């Protein structure tokens, strides 16, 4: 079954690129034609690249990896948050903090601080003994951290891969991922550089419907990866149980000749006695 159909891509406007005067020549191979000063992306290629990205994400998750969703532009914020939350993956949809990957230890300290503030707010007596001004300052600090780091609050290590909507907008995230050899899966509009992406999906990164559709496909791959992982674990458990059941039977077969040994010895003794007679 196809991951997505050509009709779905067309309906979402995935084929619309940027104006012909705003383009990256490296994207030429992904362009089908231009119409009224707008580049039209070759959706046949898009379908092929979607399949490749889907399989990569699926296998990454199947092996226990996680995907960090990144999209801070207005058109991508809702899709990134909704789809990441749907499949329980971390996300950044407001502002990318420099060093979020390359200096994750420092970010982890801020995450710890965020959890402290959240626990304080959740406790009945969390603000006991503090003035109204102090409570206000702590609340502002918590809100700021939640806005910037809320999507990665449960992330304990750097991600296995990134899903990015608009690599130009998220160029810092792309650069950090490259430094750490973290694979990047991303929508490539006609003004993007395909050389910085490991698993490109040629498409419209400005339209909300396009961002929604392509991000939902990545989430479907995450779900498929989780299912594959569960199936593999179940198969491994059954195999281990089967090996455990075989062990006693093999032990019994190994002990059987020892039990038969006395009878064989008696037969040999009788034979020797008859010979002497």
Swiss-Prot record:
Q: Where is this region: Disordered?
A: 227-277
Gene Ontology CC, one term: cytosolic small ribosomal subunit
Recorded GO molecular functions are: structural constituent of ribosome
Signal sequence coordinates = none
- Which CDD domains does the annotation name? RPS2
Q: Which SUPFAM superfamilies match?
A: Ribosomal protein S2
Q: Which Pfam families match?
A: Ribosomal_S2 (PF00318)
Is Transmembrane helix given among the entry's keywords? no
Q: Which UniProt keywords apply?
A: Ribonucleoprotein, Ribosomal protein
Q: Which domain of life is it from?
A: Bacteria
A Gene Ontology biological process noted in the UniProt record is: translation
Compositional bias annotation for Basic and acidic residues: 227-256, 267-277
Instruction: Indicate the family of this protein.
Output: Belongs to the universal ribosomal protein uS2 family.
In its UniProt entry, what is this protein called? Small ribosomal subunit protein uS2
Native organism is Corynebacterium jeikeium (strain K411)
Q: What is the lineage of its organism?
A: Bacteria, Bacillati, Actinomycetota, Actinomycetes, Mycobacteriales
Gene that produces this protein: rpsB
